[in-house]
């Protein structure tokens, strides 16, 4: 059985992925999971708005240990312009993968039109994804 796999050009050594969980996947927990063999570490979702406001708590969420790699960072929001701007502003950070949260079911997130709310209509996230993909540094 082949254990190694890839997302784009990022090699992941095994199939064990630490899911992004708000309030759980802080730096200490991620280190512990990496020590226990996680192949890909996913940070908890980070608000594009909070990054744009230079929120101190958000800065702490984005801290990455050099031993965590490969590591994925997850943005959430619903404003294509802002998300593209934030993606560009953080491209020098040491994460290997950047993704958009489209699955969070928490009412506080969904009621703001973020997370799984991006999937409520048939193709509501297509324009957001297309816009973001074209303007992100990784297209």
Question: Where do the language-model regions lie?
Answer:
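Flavin-dependent oxidoreductase catalytic cores
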Residues: 1-139
């Amino acid at each position: 059985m082949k254990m190694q796999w890839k997302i784009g050009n990022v090699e992941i050594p095994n199939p064990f992925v630490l899911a992004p969980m708000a309030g759980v996947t802080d730096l200490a927990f991620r280190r512990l999971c990496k020590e226990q063999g996680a192949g890909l570490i996913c940070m908890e979702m980070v608000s594009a708005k909070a990054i744009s406001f230079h929120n101190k708590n958000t800065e702490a969420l984005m801290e990455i240990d050099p031993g965590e790699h490969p590591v994925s960072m997850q943005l959430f929001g619903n404003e294509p312009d802002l998300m593209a701007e934030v993606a560009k502003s953080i491209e020098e950070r040491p994460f290997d993968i950047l993704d958009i949260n489209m699955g969070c079911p928490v009412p506080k997130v969904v009621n703001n039109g973020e997370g799984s709310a991006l999937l409520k209509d048939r193709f509501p996230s297509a324009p957001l994804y297309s816009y973001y993909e074209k303007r992100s540094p990784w297209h």
